[in-house]
Amino acid sequence: MTAVLPEVLVLGAGVSGLTTAVCLAEAGFPVRILAELLPHETTSFCAGAIWSPYLVSHPHVDRWSAQTLKELVGLTGDGRTGVRMVTGIEAGRTPVEPPEWATKVTDFRLCTGDELPDGFVSGWRYTVPVIDMPQYLSYLSERLSTAGGTIDKGRADALDPAPITVNCTGYEARALVPDTGIEPVRGQLVVAENPGVAEFFAEHDHDSPAPTYYLPQGGHIVLGGSAEPGRVDRTPDPAVSAAIVARCAAVEPRLRGVRITGDRVGIRPTRPTVRVEHVRENGRHVIHNYGHGGAGVSLSWGCAREVTDIVGAIDL
């Protein structure tokens, strides 16, 4: 590596782009984010979110998710971050086994029958980070600024505008790369005042177009969700929101008649496998970091650390 660290351009200001930029800046690299959507406009802003590395494929997923879990747990003591450790239940309407990652987290145990909501026959309890994404993205933005990084609003029409570019554009990578392997999955959730719910709930049915979950985040609670492949509009659908509230209230009666404060809609960038890869484009270096589906938060720090290692090994 040269004595003076080269500037790195990060494309995308969602959780993957911000986390990657933070890691690079704190490692000493001059970093600039260029993003068509600022953090509060991204799909990441619309996420629930909970650490749950589900429906993602890559040989390094276990390592990335474990690294991210460690980072998030370390942030729970800082009230600025929006990260809290929350206990809850994941349950299935049919007999299901817990994923291996769930068995390794804090307080894991199988549920007894009387702990399960009506209509559910299997489940498990555990404690994991739940993340208030608007607050968390603000924290990451401030952390980036403190480390000397900047965020500019703008659109990249090519992958190689700088000697080193990190592509964290999510669904937009479909056109930018181009990568037709990326498929959009529209997700919608509801934000409401929290009537006193302290534990999360998540339905274990990854094939459902309407997965039921709720995530308490202090004074408010996030209710979900939906999964609509191929749909890319981000206008909230009132019928979807009403169905979400009804399903969540069937699990937790205190959510009946809850006061709704907003809706969020995002486009998950699903792909057969996560792409974290270093390639050369027109003599310049491009490091891809996209295709995380609904697990962008859960893999964010692990992928960002790997990108930082890749950049650190480049000799210009």
Name every feature range the model reports, one short phrase each.
Residues 45-73:
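Glycine-rich FAD cofactor-binding loop and adjacent beta-loop-alpha segment at the N-terminus
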Residues 149-161:
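A conserved short coil-to-beta-strand element within the FAD-binding core of flavoproteins
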Residues 139, 258-316:
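C-terminal catalytic lobe of FAD-dependent flavoproteins
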Residues 26-45:
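Glycine-rich FAD pyrophosphate-binding loop
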Residues 162-246, 251-259:
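Flavin-dependent oxidoreductases
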Residues 70-148, 271:
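Flavin (FAD/FMN) cofactor-binding and adjacent substrate-gating region
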Residues 59-67, 123-139, 235-240, 299:
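Short beta-strand to alpha-helix junction loop
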Residues 8-32:
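N-terminal Rossmann-like FAD-binding beta1-loop-alpha1 element of flavoenzymes
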